[in-house]
């Protein structure tokens, strides 16, 4: 019994062990088998959840981007310079075309069974679509028919950005044949530039990818906006189900740019530049910049050549087109010469040329290459990328540095013998015989190189170089335009005594036009260096301000007192010296001329320029006018074929003066005449006794005088004033024609309270002549007579000149 029990227990233990082992093996087997499955399930449901969900959505839906409306660009007066208008992309649904055909076929069959007219259904949908759309969109019919054959697709884009005329034709087609499910016009946007070439290099242009150049590129993130989405369902075959499910996400329109450019001033600058570039036959056009002195805002940025923003890949400039033809011919000739030279070399060496090496460039190939270069050239913003030697315009910065450092003053004197020796180099002055003894104002007015070298030497190499840096000559200005270049200046380690000398008169280093006007503006605006800019503000589609430009200067380079002293000296350059061609009566203009030979020495090629500012006593605007290589008679001439002298004073100064006068008038500045403006310089009265009126008129006008006659005789019998008596120019003299003769004396009128013009007319009427006087030296419409040399009612000699004193009645 005990033995049996013992065996039974042992059997149970054995079974239990077997069961445990079996369970363990089953569990182990289960773990081995199912653990990877559980891991894979975990990966699918947890680790890759987001990815798989996205892929599922992609397989089940289609996302069609909806273009956002690009922001508008406005000029400083709120006129639209660049705007996006709604245009349309043309899309067809081959599946819907096939379904429409099936629908027609069924209706035709039903009508035939009923004995009804089948003509309304007796046409082919695909033929109608292909025939009409290929004509409207100028597409290849065979290519369009192959697209229609893909009947599983519901989306085939045929054309992009069609305009209203073609849109209307397609809508008529859709309506006439009930093709609204077959043809779809998807809204898109197209960029338009209403003023075509106005400020073209500033604004830039767009392509299919967005902003490609200029502000359109620089501010792409602001202008572009955020596209919307049209989400539609797709079936298992991947076909769009446009009418089954749709979800529309609105696009967010782009922000708007508001520029500093004044359209009136920009047009002044562009038209003036084009006129004179044509006159001077400039080989590489020119530039005009206009900046607001106390803010750095760019009011105009003009250049030639330029282009039409609506057709930016076309060249229309006559000078560029002629250069393209010339360059193409030269390229072909050069290619022929290279092949000839290569053949000669191979014959000598006993080798041969490959067919490619023997190929001569065709005129068509050369023309296309030259045309592409011309397109790039007209896109280039010369104002911020081209570099040139500033020449004597840079002397304004040397003047400012010298006055600020106290190494010179208005009382400083300079000797000029016509040249100066610097190290082993003889540097000549423009006046080969020299200017002799001169003070500071005269030295700057004469643009005397030896005097400027002396100032630079007094400053010293280190201080001079520091001012190059402080005036911003070493760095980009930071203007808010892409691709700004920076000039070429010696590194300090290479800046020695000869470099110091040539730098003093603006040669052997280069700047961009924007660098030069920014530095010069610092000299005259109180000494403050501003960052130039063309974008004044950015607004959102609702008009809210996103960005407002800051007018804070970067730094003060010279004191306001030094700046005032510079303005006085530079005004003298215009009123008395090399810049006198910029002089405009009634306007106080200051400035500096510049003439520099290009990199091709002894080529007769020059950069001629002038920087002018006004009003000189409180500068409001500053302009840079630069002509790039006016055409000369020959390589050794400084005269153009039509006789213009190639120099900054002869070419650029009058253009700048004319432009500044227009700008000041436009901006509402009152004219302020000097006594010379008002009454002219004194001129001796000629003897016209016995002459006819016509003979006397010619002589009197040559003296810059006016006249009136008394009497009806044939010849002059008397005149006021007498022969040889000096009278102010612009005065009206009296010619007596006949027996009537003037009395010797006349009563002086009461001139109190009269304006300069009124006083002059009142005196001239009586045969008296006025010499104006004013405490400020200038006269405006607010100036009135407060004193007169001869008292009212006093007997005075006819034909004599009398002093009249004016005071500004406005209280300013």
Task: Give the location of each predicted region.
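Sec-exported extracytoplasmic/periplasmic mature domains
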Residues: 134-138, 175, 207, 224, ...
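Acidic/histidine-enriched alpha-helical segments
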Residues: 143-151, 190, 282-295, 415-419, ...
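Beta-lactam-recognizing serine transpeptidase/beta-lactamase-like catalytic domain environment
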Residues: 5, 82, 88, 235-248, ...
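Short secondary-structure junction motifs
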Residues: 180, 283-286, 409-411, 476, ...
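Short flexible coil/turn linkers enriched for glycine and charged/polar residues
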Residues: 196, 617-619, 729
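Short, solvent-exposed beta-strand edge segments and adjacent coil->beta transition regions
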Residues: 87, 153-155, 252-256, 381-385, ...
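Ligand-recognition elements built from short beta-strands and adjacent flexible loops
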Residues: 495, 549, 586, 590, ...
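Periplasmic/cell-envelope proteins involved in peptidoglycan metabolism and beta-lactam response
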Residues: 1-361, 378, 387, 462-474, ...
């Amino acid at each position: 019994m005990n033995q049996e029990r013992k065996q039974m227990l042992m059997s149970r233990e054995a079974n239990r062990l077997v069961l445990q082992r079996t369970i363990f093996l089953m569990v182990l087997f289960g773990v081995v088998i199912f653990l990877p499955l559980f891991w894979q399930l975990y990966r699918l449901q947890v680790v890759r959840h987001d990815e798989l969900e996205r892929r599922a959505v992609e397989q089940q839906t289609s996302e069609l981007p909806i273009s956002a409306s690009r922001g508008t660009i406005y000029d400083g007066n709120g006129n639209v310079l660049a705007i996006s208008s709604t245009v349309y992309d043309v899309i067809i649904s081959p599946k819907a075309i096939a379904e429409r055909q099936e629908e027609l076929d069924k209706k035709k069959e039903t009508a035939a069974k009923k004995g009804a007219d089948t003509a309304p259904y007796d046409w082919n949908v695909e033929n109608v679509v292909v025939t009409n759309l290929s004509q409207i969109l100028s597409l290849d019919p065979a290519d369009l028919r192959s697209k229609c054959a893909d009947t599983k697709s519901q989306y085939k884009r045929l054309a992009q950005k069609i305009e209203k005329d073609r849109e209307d034709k397609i809508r008529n087609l859709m309506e006439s044949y009930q093709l609204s499910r077959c043809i779809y016009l998807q809204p898109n946007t197209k960029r338009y530039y209403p003023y075509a070439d106005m400020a073209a290099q500033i604004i830039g242009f767009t392509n299919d990818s967005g902003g490609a150049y200029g502000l359109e590129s620089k501010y792409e993130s602001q202008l572009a906006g955020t596209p919307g989405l049209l989400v539609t369902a797709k079936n298992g075959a991947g076909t769009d189900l446009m009418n089954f499910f749709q979800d529309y996400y609105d696009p967010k329109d782009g922000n708007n740019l508001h520029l500093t450019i004044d359209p009136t001033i920009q047009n002044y600058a562009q038209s003036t530049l084009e006129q004179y570039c044509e006159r001077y036959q400039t080989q590489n056009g020119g530039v005009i910049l206009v900046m607001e002195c106390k803010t750095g805002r760019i009011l105009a940025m003009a250049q030639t050549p330029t282009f039409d923003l609506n057709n930016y890949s076309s060249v229309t400039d006559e000078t560029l087109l002629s250069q393209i033809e010339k360059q193409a011919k030269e390229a072909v000739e050069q290619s022929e010469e290279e092949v000839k030279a290569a053949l000669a070399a191979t014959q000598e060496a006993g080798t041969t040329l490959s067919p490619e090496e023997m190929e001569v460039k065709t005129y068509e190939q050369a023309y296309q290459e030259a045309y592409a270069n011309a397109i790039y050239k007209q896109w280039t913003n010369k104002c911020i990328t081209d570099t040139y030697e500033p020449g004597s315009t840079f002397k304004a910065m040397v003047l400012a540095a010298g006055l600020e450092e106290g190494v010179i003053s208005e009382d400083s004197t300079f000797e000029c013998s016509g040249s100066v020796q610097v190290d082993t180099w003889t540097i000549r002055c423009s006046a080969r015989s020299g200017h002799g003894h001169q003070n500071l104002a005269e030295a700057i007015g004469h643009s005397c190189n030896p005097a400027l070298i002396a100032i630079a030497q007094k400053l010293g190499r280190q201080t001079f170089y520091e001012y190059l840096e402080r005036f911003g000559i070493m760095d980009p200005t930071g203007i808010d335009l892409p691709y700004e270049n920076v000039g070429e200046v010696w590194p300090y380690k290479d800046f020695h005594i000869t470099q110091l000398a040539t730098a003093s008169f603006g040669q052997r280093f280069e700047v961009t036009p924007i660098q030069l006007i920014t530095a010069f503006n610092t000299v005259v605006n109180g000494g403050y260096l501003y960052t130039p800019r063309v974008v004044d503000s950015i607004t959102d589609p609702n008009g809210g301000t996103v960005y407002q430009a800051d007018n804070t200067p970067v730094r003060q380079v010279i004191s306001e007192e030094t700046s005032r002293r510079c303005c006085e000296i530079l005004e003298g350059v215009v009123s008395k010296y090399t810049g006198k061609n910029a002089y405009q009566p009634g306007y106080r203009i200051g400035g500096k001329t510049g003439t520099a030979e290009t990199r091709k020495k002894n080529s007769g090629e020059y950069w001629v320029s002038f920087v002018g500012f006004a009003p000189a006593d409180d500068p409001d605007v500053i302009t840079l006018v630069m002509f790039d290589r006016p055409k000369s008679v020959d390589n050794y001439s400084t005269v153009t074929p039509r006789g213009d002298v190639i120099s900054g004073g002869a070419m650029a100064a009058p253009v700048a003066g004319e432009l500044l006068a227009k700008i000041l008038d436009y901006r509402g500045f009152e004219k302020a005449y000097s006594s010379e403006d008002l009454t002219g310089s004194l001129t001796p009265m000629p003897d016209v006794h016995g002459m006819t009126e016509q003979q006397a008129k010619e002589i009197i006008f040559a003296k810059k005088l006016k006249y009136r006659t008394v009497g009806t005789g044939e010849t002059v019998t008397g005149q006021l004033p007498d022969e040889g008596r000096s009278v102010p120019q612009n005065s009206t003299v009296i010619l007596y024609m006949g027996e009537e003769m003037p009395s010797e004396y006349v009563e002086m009128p009461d001139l109190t309270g009269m304006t300069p013009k009124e006083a002059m007319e009142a005196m001239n009427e009586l045969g008296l002549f006025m010499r104006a006087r004013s405490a400020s030296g200038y006269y405006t419409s607010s100036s009135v007579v407060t004193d007169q040399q001869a008292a009212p009612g006093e007997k005075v000699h006819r034909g004599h000149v009398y002093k009249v004193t004016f005071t500004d009645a406005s209280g300013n």
